[in-house]
Amino acid sequence: MTGRGRAEVALALVDSVDGLGPDWLARVEAAQRAHPAEPAVQAAVGAVLAERQLWGKARRPLEMAAKDPQLQGRARRQAWRALARLATEEGDDARALECLRLAAAQD
């Protein structure tokens, strides 16, 4: 699969992450190991880990996706929103608000 094809599949996964089962964890972690520099793959990994509430593992790929200017705005926005949920889970309301502000600023 080409890089563009991987990005399309990864972004489709980000959009449909609600309710994904644990069987997806191994798949996205394998994709992350195989393509660690691809922002769309990081976005998908972070989204799946966040959906499973694996916040510690989700933080790094979500931060990478949120901050990558090559990634589509909607995927960056979703990453910032997931980071806001993570901050809320940790009781860091100031960080949660900052993440929501950054999510709103995405095009």
Residue ranges, per PLM feature:
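Small/polar glycine-rich anion-binding or flexible loop at a beta-alpha turn
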Residues: A79-L83
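C-terminal soluble interaction/assembly domains
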Residues: R74-Q78
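Generic anion/oxyanion-binding catalytic loop in active/binding sites
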Residues: A47, A84-R85
